[in-house]
Regions:
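N-terminal helical cap/lid subdomain that shapes the substrate entry/recognition surface
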Residues: 2-112
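Structured helix-beta-strand junction loops
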Residues: 123-124
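Asp-based, Mg2+/Mn2+-dependent phosphohydrolase catalytic module
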Residues: 1-6, 16-18, 22, 41-45, ...
Length: 239
């Protein structure tokens, strides 16, 4: 069946996280600085220890449930364990999340191929974006910063709907928004366990953009593997 819709992952597909995980320590320090400025008097070492305990527990739960609680919950739970009574909607928590997000964004660059590829596909196919991120506001800011938002007919960020890839629901929601069948859609992403297994299980085609050494132990194989976004264009001509 002819492909009518092309959907993309965001991070390490359309935009690149520079330096792997190099962003995390400075982003967390920026978050902690904000908290200190707002009467949260906890040494960074203590905050760091409890934060990772909370984060790892939430990650473990998310791997099972495929839910994506907002990053705010991570911070509020950390502070509750440290003796502070903040809920996830408190302005201090939201400000701390924003501080983390702003530092993280300094480590993000646009894949130089992304604008031209999206420009070529826009109008010819329905376009969608599905991203796993617990700070959806950050994803929207990046899409604005790099002038990508207007290319897409649907944009789904996991932290907004409390579902994350590879859950069937997040892909099905995107397909419904685009008005296409799974067999008429193709997904492009860099993480085999999320961006290949997820769409393939609901009946979509999936293309892996290889940003790291090949994993030959993938349980579910991509339909194609590419190393640059521009390689997607001739593949679509044959679909």
């Amino acid at each position: 069946m002819r492909i009518k819709a092309v959907l993309f992952d965001l991070f390490d597909t359309l935009v690149i996280i520079e330096g792997g995980g190099a962003h995390y320590a400075p982003s967390l320090r920026k978050l902690h600085e904000f908290l200190r400025e707002n009467q949260v008097n906890v040494p960074f070492e203590d905050f760091h220890k409890i934060y990772f305990q909370v984060r790892d527990k939430l990650y473990s739960e998310s791997r099972e449930s495929l839910e994506e609680p907002h990053f705010n919950l991570r911070i509020s739970q950390t502070l509750q364990k440290l003796g502070y009574n903040f809920n996830a909607e408190d302005p201090v928590i939201k400000g701390a999340t924003q501080a983390f997000s702003e530092k993280f964004m300094e480590y993000i660059s646009l894949d130089p191929d992304a604008p031209q590829v999206l420009e070529r596909l826009h109008g010819k196919y329905k376009l969608g974006l599905i991203s796993n991120l617990a700070i959806p506001e950050c994803a929207w800011k990046l899409l604005e910063k790099f002038n990508l938002k207007n290319f897409f007919d649907t944009i789904i960020i996991s932290g907004e709907i409390n579902r994350r890839k590879p859950s069937a629901e997040i892909f099905q929601k995107a397909l419904k928004n685009l008005g296409v069948k799974a067999s008429e859609a193709l997904f492009v992403g860099d993480m085999p366990g999320l961006d290949i297994a997820g769409p393939k299980k609901v009946g979509m085609k999936a293309i892996l953009i290889q940003r790291r050494p090949a994993n030959n132990k993938m349980e579910i194989k991509p339909d194609k593997t590419i190393k640059r976004l521009t390689e997607l264009l001739p593949i679509l001509e044959d679909c």
